[in-house]
């Protein structure tokens, strides 16, 4: 009975998630706390950001929706900084044994001018469930650009999952694991201790989705974050601490009907 209930809830959550962020494209906890915009914050939403990284980075995240372990997303990856073409590898898993979504992603970025960077990514998303006799997947691509008119301002534009090609069982509707969307956003370091970020998104399900976030840095090692996202309205809150090359981030998102989702992330930069 529990498995049946969880499967029904999974289908419902998948439906709710189509409009903006699919179950597999969960950003790092910093970005999630800032409203989950991401187009100027994480290479997962904009591969061009790889070109602006100054260090290599390993990371791992755990995000639990609504305190239900079967709705957890686990992700990890590595961003490699080099002078030729910075690259990244990301792996994500959502669900549990009876229902599993997986993502394997490779991305590249390149600074093409003093103020411009361009990036592309290729990913394979896989859906496996006891409800289906066969698995189903999608191969898709992302493209993104970043423009920095001045040192403390960045703007970004990315197109996610375009194009997208279905593999495996064609009778399974798996569009939610590779939902097409276009994002445009900015971040602005107003002063040394405050950063604001905002994103507008157009997707297959929602004409416009918006997010806004703010990060306050009372100390170099400690950061407090808050954000909000529309469709539906979801406020978020989080914090981060850095020590000896390690970043530890926590975050939570509140949904008026389904409750609180929480997560933790750890990264090492060198």
Region spans (language model):
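Cleavable N-terminal export/targeting peptides
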Residues: 1-29, 269
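Subset of outer-membrane beta-barrel
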Residues: 21-270
């Amino acid at each position: 009975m529990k498995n049946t209930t969880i499967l029904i809830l999974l289908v419902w959550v998948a439906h709710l998630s189509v409009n903006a962020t699919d179950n597999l494209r969960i950003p790092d906890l910093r970005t999630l706390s800032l409203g989950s915009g991401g187009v100027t914050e994480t290479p997962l939403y904009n591969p061009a950001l790889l070109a602006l990284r100054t260090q290599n980075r390993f990371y791992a995240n755990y995000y639990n929706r609504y305190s239900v372990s079967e709705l957890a997303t686990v992700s990890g990856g590595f961003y490699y900084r080099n002078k030729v073409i910075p690259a990244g590898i990301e792996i994500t898993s959502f669900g549990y044994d009876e229902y599993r979504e997986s993502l394997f992603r490779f991305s590249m970025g390149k600074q093409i001018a003093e103020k411009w960077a361009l990036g592309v990514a290729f990913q394979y998303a896989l859906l496996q469930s006891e409800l289906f006799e066969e698995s189903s997947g999608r191969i898709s691509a992302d493209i993104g650009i970043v423009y920095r008119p001045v040192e403390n301002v960045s703007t970004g534009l990315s197109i996610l999952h375009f194009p997208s090609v279905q593999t495996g069982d064609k009778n399974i509707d798996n569009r939610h694991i590779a939902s097409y969307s276009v994002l445009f956003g900015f971040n602005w370091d107003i002063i040394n201790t405050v950063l604001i970020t905002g994103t507008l998104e157009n997707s297959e399900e929602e004409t416009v989705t918006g997010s806004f976030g703010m990060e306050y840095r009372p100390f170099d090692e400690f950061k407090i974050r808050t954000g909000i996202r529309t469709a539906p309205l979801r406020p978020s809150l989080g914090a981060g601490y850095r020590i000896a090359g390690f970043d530890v981030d926590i975050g939570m998102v509140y949904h008026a009907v389904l409750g609180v989702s929480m997560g933790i992330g750890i990264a090492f930069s060198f």
